[in-house]
Regions:
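Catalytic beta/alpha-barrel core
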Residues: 39-43, 101-116, 134-141, 159-164, ...
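Glycine-rich phosphate-binding active-site loops on the catalytic face of alpha/beta enzymes
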Residues: 108, 157-168, 232-247
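Alpha-helix-loop-beta-strand connector modules within alpha/beta enzyme cores
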Residues: 21-26, 47-73, 118-133, 185-206, ...
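Hydrophobic faces of well-ordered beta-strands that scaffold small-molecule active sites
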Residues: 1-4, 39-41, 61-66, 100-104, ...
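Structured C-terminal cap/extension of enzyme domains
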Residues: 11-16, 21-31, 35-40, 56, ...
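Histidine/lysine/aspartate-rich catalytic loop segments that bind and position anionic ligands
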Residues: 149-180, 184
Length: 263
């Protein structure tokens, strides 16, 4: 809803143009009516306008926030300590909207891991618990998910990207011998993350189920991608599926596909 298309800047703008405050409220009302009880979104300062309108319209959908230092202030530094501090500040700002959970951003987690500072996440988890919300940790890398499980930082849930979008060029060279033009969406990623998700004992919210629209060429392709996700995660897990209902009723379409997958 805030223009994260994972396609290009033009498509980001296309989404932002359509998703006015009133449309965001309307879509979330439609979600709630269709049986979707939780909205997950990255922290955005526009929420200070949107949430009063949303609650004023009688929508009680739950909110899970994805926090990152750059969402709080894009000018903040990117050292591990600065990312931790900024993400905690982001989580504190998000508490205004009464989230049921706040997750540490996947790119931020992956940054800490590369820097050998993954233990800083324990501080984040403790701070979010002190705020009164469930604490989550997101990642794009199945190896990091396994490490988090071993470390046992006390978080309540994970967010797990089915595509490893935080690879560095050297990672691509080591794995595939080349570097992609875009973020890098490859078919071998989802099974690896799904396998890691099945090995952790906490709930995981799995995202990039439709590969940011790359598995939306047909209704059958979408249906198969959603079914595959549910067939390969734990019963206590759930999916995060982005919608952009500009041209069709994606709320109804997606909820129907999820119900079919779970039937």
């Amino acid at each position: 809803m805030f223009g994260y298309s994972h396609v290009n800047r033009q498509y980001d703008m296309h989404m932002r143009e359509w998703y006015t405050d009133d449309r965001i409220v309307g879509v979330l009302q439609d979600c709630e009516k269709a049986g979707i009880n939780t909205w997950q979104a990255s922290f955005n300062w526009d929420m200070k306008r949107i949430f009063p309108k949303l609650r004023g319209a009688g929508c009680n959908i739950q909110f899970i926030c994805l926090a990152a230092s750059w969402h709080f202030d894009e000018k903040m530094g990117r050292t591990p300590e600065e990312v931790l501090d900024g993400t905690i500040k982001c989580a504190q700002a998000a508490m205004e909207f009464k989230p049921i959970g706040i997750a540490f951003h996947g790119h931020a987690t992956d940054l800490l891991f590369r820097a050998g500072k993954i233990d800083l996440l324990k501080t984040y988890v403790d701070k979010v618990h002190d705020m009164g919300a469930a604490a989550g940790i997101s990642t794009h890398n199945p190896k990091i998910l396994a490490t988090l499980h071993e470390k046992g930082f006390g978080n309540d849930f994970y967010m797990a990207g089915l595509h490893y979008l935080s690879r560095h060029p050297e990672d691509w060279i080591a794995e595939l011998g080349t570097v992609p033009v875009d973020e890098g969406w490859i078919a071998s990623d989802p099974p690896k993350m799904a396998a890691a998700v099945r090995q952790v004992d906490k709930p995981a919210l799995v995202y990039k189920v439709l590969s940011a629209g790359r598995k939306c060429s047909s209704e059958d392709q979408k249906r198969k991608a959603i079914a595959w996700a549910y067939q390969n995660i734990k019963p206590i897990d759930a999916t995060i599926i982005g919608i952009y209902p500009r041209y069709s009723n994606q709320v109804a379409e997606t909820t129907q596909m999820v119900r079919e997958a779970l039937s």
